Amino acid sequence: MKTLLLTLLVVTIVCLDLAHTRICYSHKLLQAKTTKTCEENSCYKRSLPKIPLIIIGRGCGCPLTLPFLRIKCCTSDKCN
């Protein structure tokens, strides 16, 4: 019985992913959608300020913004 409980505990920890990783889309313009498991707790989406529907890139973390780029950061899985 103790072995069964220990096994269930290990499976629960693995499934819950207590390492606090984030799943983010990680691809550039005109590439197929890919995902990446990131250690950072945020994802970003980079686009042009004048044309926000054209997404230049996506990835892990939250990079610094530049005047000619729009960067949206978020903190849930596949939010970018």
Curated annotation (Swiss-Prot):
Q: What else is known?
A: Negative results: does not inhibit growth of reference strains of E.coli or S.aureus (MIC values >200 ug/ml).
What family does the database annotate?
Belongs to the three-finger toxin family. Short-chain subfamily. Orphan group X sub-subfamily.
Q: In which tissues is it expressed?
A: Expressed by the venom gland.
**What is the protein name stated in its UniProt record?**
Toxin C13S1C1
Supply the Pfam families for this chain: Toxin_cobra-type
Its GO CC terms are:
extracellular region
> Does the entry annotate any disulfide bonds, and if so which pairs?
24-43, 38-60, 62-73, 74-79
InterPro entries, sorted? Snake_3FTx, Snake_toxin-like_sf, Snake_toxin_con_site, Toxin_cobra-type
Subcellular location per UniProt equals: Secreted
Q: Which SUPFAM superfamilies match?
A: Snake toxin-like
> Which keywords accompany this UniProt record?
Disulfide bond, Secreted, Signal, Toxin
Organism superkingdom? Eukaryota
Signal sequence residues:
1-21
User: What Gene Ontology terms describe what this protein does at the molecular function level?
Assistant: toxin activity
Q: What does this protein do?
A: Shows low hemolytic activity against human erythrocytes (LC(50)>600 ug/ml). Is also cytotoxic against human umbilical vein endothelial HUVEC cells (57 ug/ml) indicating no differential activity against cell lines derived from neoplastic tissues.
